[in-house]
């Protein structure tokens, strides 16, 4: 579970760091699923990048959110910084890029 520190816009996200570099995320701030890649950096660091496509009610692409992040794992916790940009269907910026810090905690596997 990841919590970005965005003033006035708190939200939570769930991210999966899969074997082979697969990265998936979904959050309470946007519809859709972010899909990308992640890579280890040194003994406890990581980077990830993902895109999240948004479609209008007509089924046409309306915007693309791109996130690039780096951080550190510390046991079952993580911290880092991420930059987010949002572009329209032609690639032109819809809003200025935003950089935020984030923290997160591993979701533990539990028996029923």
Locations of the language-model features?
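Well-ordered beta-strand positions in beta-sheet-rich domains
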Residues: 12-14, 35-37, 66-70, 97-103
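Edge beta-strand at a domain terminus
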Residues: 84-112
């Amino acid at each position: 579970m990841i919590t970005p520190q965005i003033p006035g816009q708190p939200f939570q996200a769930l991210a999966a760091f899969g074997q082979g570099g697969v990265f998936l995320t979904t959050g309470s701030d946007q519809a859709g699923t972010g899909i990308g890649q992640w890579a280890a950096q040194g003994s406890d660091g990581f980077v990830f990048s993902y895109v999240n496509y948004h479609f209008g009610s007509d089924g046409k692409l309306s915007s693309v959110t791109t996130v690039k992040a780096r951080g550190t794992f510390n046991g079952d916790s993580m911290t880092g910084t991420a930059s987010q940009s949002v572009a329209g269907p032609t690639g032109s910026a819809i809003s200025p890029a935003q950089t935020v810090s984030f923290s997160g905690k591993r979701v533990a596997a539990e028996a029923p």
